Amino acid sequence: LRSADAGDNWNRVGIGQGIHSDAVIRCLAVHPDKPNFIYAGCDKGIYTSDDAGATWSLSENPLNDYTVWSLAIDGQDPDLMYAGTGTPTPTVCFRSRDGGSTWEKTSMEAAAECPAVGTPRVTGIAIDPTDAKSIWVGIEVDGLRHTADGGDTWTTIDYSDIPNMDIHNVAVSAGPPKTVVVVVNHDVYTSTDNGTTWKSIGVREGFDLGYPRGIKVQPGSPNVIFLTLGDTTPGSTGCIMRSKDTGRNWERLPLPVEPNTAMW
């Protein structure tokens, strides 16, 4: 869907605008220096638009054989991108060094099968804004991965540190303090020591709704983090929570209408 009037009205982007009628869009990413240039990951690869979503074209590259669930662009070097794939296609973290023109597989490994979803899927990729070689990848349902060398080698975060393999999303705030935020099924974990230790924020105990999905750091205000939740999936209601202190305290934001589904 696309709105050209700040969200008052919405229209479906269809085949007339270049997107195949049965394409299932899983993620969006906006070029940090060219706000009209948008990437859309889907079950056919990656579509791109250079006119703020009015028209689209399908990029021809190896990702055409994969379902793309997540995208990340380095804010300092937009030519550096990562794409995560999965269900029903293999789980891979791809890397591009030329703005998405070409892609290569990184060495990240994932389980072939996992509970609930079958083939795991990369549901979140976060590039550390203070160190572009540090990337965090969340996999549903196969845990959290981290690379300190731009994707050449990877480590798996121990299950005892984050006792939930069902990763929904991940973000990194520059802080201070620099904070890694990991969204899991029914909770959120934060780390201020680059993943050495983790702390639960207690979603079930402290929030009205207990099914978190989306996480976003506000550009230009790294201590401000937004979290989207629902009652379940697909759910019957949702909300947006905001933290102004890098995840220590949260407030529910008012919405103009009551959502009828979980917010992703």
State what each model feature region is.
Residues 1-264:
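Extracellular glycan-interacting surfaces
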